[in-house]
């Protein structure tokens, strides 16, 4: 049956395809949220301040785990910057390569120097001579 100009199309609502978060994801997100206090942990130039994203240091597609050491709370602008300027983000430890250990690799933290993140949601300052 052909459509006429006066007939209306029925639209159905789009269904979300996102799976329910795992326990590991929930725990990692909660620990990072507490550590950051809801603020962007990257604090790059142009930072929006409030954290809205969970930024993986080792990407999920590269085998990166859901863990507090592998995640940073980020505003959308800082998170986008990391993906558009990958080499610079790697130099700052904001993005790691597959196989790198996020519990060992230092990360530039809120313009306050380099720290090492652990899986309990803590951060540990790194002395300048420890950064190679």
What are the language-model segments listed below?
Residues 1-39, 43-51, 90, 96-132:
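A boundary/linker detector
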Residues 19, 23, 66, 73:
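A short glycine-/small-residue-rich loop at the edge of a beta-strand within enzyme catalytic domains
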Residues 37-38, 70-72:
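Short, surface-exposed beta-edge/turn micro-motifs
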Residues 45-49, 71-92:
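Short Cys/His-centered divalent metal-binding micro-motifs
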Residues 55-56, 79:
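Histidine-centered divalent metal-coordination motifs
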Residues 58-71:
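Short linker/helix segments within small regulatory modules
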Residues 67, 77-80, 98-101:
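Glycine-rich loops and low-complexity Gly/Arg-rich segments
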């Amino acid at each position: 049956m052909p459509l006429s100009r006066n007939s209306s199309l029925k639209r159905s609502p789009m269904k979300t395809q996102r799976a329910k978060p795992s326990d590991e994801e929930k725990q990692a997100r909660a620990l990072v949220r507490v550590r950051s206090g809801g603020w962007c942990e990257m604090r790059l130039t142009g930072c929006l301040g409030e954290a809205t994203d969970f930024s993986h240091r080792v990407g999920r597609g590269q085998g990166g785990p859901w863990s507090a050491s592998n995640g940073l709370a980020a505003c959308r602008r800082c998170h986008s910057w990391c993906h558009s300027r990958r080499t610079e983000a790697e130099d700052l430890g904001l993005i790691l390569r597959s196989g790198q250990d996020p519990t060992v690799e230092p990360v530039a933290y809120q313009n306050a120097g380099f720290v090492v993140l652990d899986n309990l949601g803590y951060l540990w300052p790194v002395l300048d001579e420890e950064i190679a």
